[in-house]
Amino acid sequence: SHKAIATGLTPNTTYSYRVGYDGNWSNIKSFITANTNKEEFKFLYMTDSHIMDNEYVENARWSAITAAKQAPDAKFLLFTGDFVETGTEQNSEWEWEQWFEVSMKPLLSRMALAPTDGNHDDTPNLNYTYHFNTDKAFNETATVKPQFDGITYSFVYGDALFMVYSHQDFWRGSYSYANGTSTYLSNDVANWFRDQVEKYPDTKWRIAAVHKNLFTGSGHQADEDGALFRATLLPVFQELNIDFVIQGHDHIYEVMGPINNTTKTIVPGSVTNVELVSPDSNKNPKGQQGGTFNVKEGTLYFVNGTCGRKRYYPYTQDEMEAGFDKHKVEGYWDLFTGKYGQPGAPAFSEISVSSSEIEVKTYTSDANAQATLFDTFKIVKNGNTGIEENKQSAKLYPTYAKDKINTTESDIIRVNAIDLTGKIYPLPFDNQHIDVSNLTDGI
């Protein structure tokens, strides 16, 4: 492992470099340092390549080639873990070589990489740490030492504070699944978050990046460590007004929130402009896409699927409710306010950040480097939503097919039906036409 640190660089400047030794030098590459102002910028987000064989290498390479073509002005790649497959063993160096030299080479020759530790990247030989050169200050001050150096670090780009961290070491020190406690997360990691926010108080956006999910809608939804993560870190996110959490791990596309991290419910009036489309059991079971999400009073949680081959599939509402005893989140289905489903192909996100909004465009890729838009949404942070609720009651006569009710109200933000037990059922709508076809008798 060879690492170098460049110092004394000037902002917004192009530098060229090569790597090697006398008689054996690489080609000359170049990079541009960040500007010091808060101008708009783009970055790329990918996750879960799980490099294990040539098919997985190629799927991830499609994502990289397509992303380089789609967003040539992106400043860096944020990768939220599971670079390779051979976790919990002595990591195969072949997998790492393929990730750097084949799959991601189209991107890494032109931009920086912000890596996030995933569970498949953890190995007894500490191989993850040999491939990255991130800040190690957290490890030097933590009372409970994580396994790897440099897995918890932050940086500022434009008007955004990025806080990259890991859940992987939650079991070091004292912890309890039953009580939802972890001294590592609630002390060291939580205080680190507080320190970063205190150090950079004037950035508009606070973005966290982590591999394992705090909220998700697929195979890891009922994991007991996920419940522990929520118990220890959601209060911290609420305290610090974390705006956007970019995750990995569950290999599906999901836009969740903005969530009040105390109540684990959607912040009233925070979701607008979601488009209703025909549902698809795998790609879009809720029939929603797009949207504008106001994170002034909550946090938006996001996963864009996988840049590779391994895919999971979305749970139904019944499956989510059946897992309540484990995940302990009431109304989990209602947290999926944007598009939710399986893209069915390698995916990447092009994320534009300005002082007024964050725009997220997610594309799928193929062997021909063809980008196909899968979803796009915006994040804003407005103090006053300007939303006034007009609560009305109406008799509903569902037929389970295509019933709708109409209203003369305009500028509708959301519609809920409430049964006699007080349970809330969010209803899709298109302008002044409210879809009630999925409601059962008696509501």
What residue spans do the PLM features occupy?
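Metal-dependent phosphoesterase/phosphodiesterase active-site architecture
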Residues: 1, 25, 126-208, 213-222, ...
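Divalent metal-dependent phosphoesterase catalytic cores across multiple superfamilies
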Residues: 1-117, 122-149, 187, 191-195, ...
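Short strand-edge motifs at loop-to-beta-strand transitions and within beta-strands
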Residues: 2-4, 349, 432-434
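Generic short beta-strand
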Residues: 17, 360, 414-415
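Short coil/turn segments at beta-strand junctions that form active-site/ligand-binding loops
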Residues: 75, 111, 203-205, 413
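C-terminal outer-membrane/trafficking sorting elements
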Residues: 388-443
